[in-house]
Regions:
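Soluble extramembrane regions of membrane proteins in the secretory/endomembrane system
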Residues: 1-167
């Protein structure tokens, strides 16, 4: 229907509630025989970390996926520790959810902690797949127009869906 669209390079992103739509789009896309979405950037929201039974899961499959998680986000990035104590957004990288995401949906227990701003790669279905979490030191509403967040958007999509002529 749109011959100018490269169907092998479709990326989706959204800030806050827009990322809920992104996660919903991925779930719907997973029902397609041939998924259309190649790259996902979740912006100030949470990825889908577990299935309905609470087991870690990789709903993103062989897509490149990143998260922009503002350090001082007032709404997202919270979790609980192994004792059930609430962890707020500044401690997101210490959470099992963040670590599971960077370990491609597997249980991170007993594994070395992974860091923000690092692309992690794994072979999934014969494809080299990336995961990254960006942690700009800002609050939730600042993130959608922050130069730090927008730099992350450009970096992520240039890595996931490289332009034929790199963006300068």
């Amino acid at each position: 229907r749109m011959p100018f669209v490269d169907k092998g390079k479709i990326g989706v992103t959204g800030h806050s509630m827009g990322s809920w739509s992104v996660n919903a789009a991925v779930k719907q896309d997973n029902l397609n025989e041939t998924p259309l979405i190649s790259a996902v950037l979740i912006h100030c929201n949470d990825a889908v970390y577990t299935d309905d039974d609470g087991n870690y899961v990789n709903i993103y499959g062989s897509r490149d996926v990143g998260i922009i998680s503002a350090v001082y986000d007032e709404f997202f990035g919270g979790s609980v520790d192994e004792n059930g104590n609430a962890l707020q957004s500044p401690y997101y990288m210490e959470s099992a959810n963040a670590q599971s995401f960077l370990y491609f949906g597997t249980d991170p227990s007993g594994k070395e902690a992974r860091e923000a701003y690092t692309f992690y790669t794994e072979n999934i279905d014969g494809k080299e797949v990336n995961r990254i979490i960006y942690r700009p030191g800002i609050i939730h509403p600042w993130s959608h127009f922050s130069a730090r967040s927008e730099k992350a958007v450009c970096e992520f999509f240039e890595k996931a869906l490289p332009a034929p002529n790199p963006i300068a």
